[in-house]
Amino acid sequence: MIIALADLGDADVQALIAFHQQAMQAGSPPGLSFALDLSGLADPVVSVWAVRVDDRVAAIGALKLLGGGQAELKSMRTHPDFLRRGIAAQLLEAIIDHARSQAITRLSLETGGGPAFDPALALYRKRGFVNGAAFGDYVLTDFNQCLHLTLV
């Protein structure tokens, strides 16, 4: 397994990004999916990683710098062929390590609720993320929730 900054021009990376965005839109009430598309992930304040296993893109994840020592975890997605292998947990650790190296003191994320989101929520909570207040432009709803991890 290799975790490295992603080449957003790579067709396999683009396909997993598109799959993630489609799944988030399909599994969220109208107007409550905030998954970034390829152009959003290309923003200079966003870093995107890809995990490769046997030369296949197994997962992606991104970190968006928010300023003031804060950053947002974005676009975490494991390809269906690679689920339940611990890949997402290793990718999450790599992103957290990078955040620390950038002097980030709080890492936040916004996600949905319900069965489709339970595996991701379990991963984040196991790593120490806790539910909290909305951040940025997000608004908490019956569907959306925000989680935070203090980095020291």
Where are these regions (language model features)?
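Flexible, active-site-proximal loop/turn residues at the rims of small-molecule/cofactor binding pockets
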Residues: 67, 82, 113
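Residues forming the Rossmann-fold NAD(P)(H) cofactor-binding site
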Residues: 85, 89, 93
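Acetyl-CoA-dependent GNAT
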Residues: 1-70, 74, 79, 92-93, ...
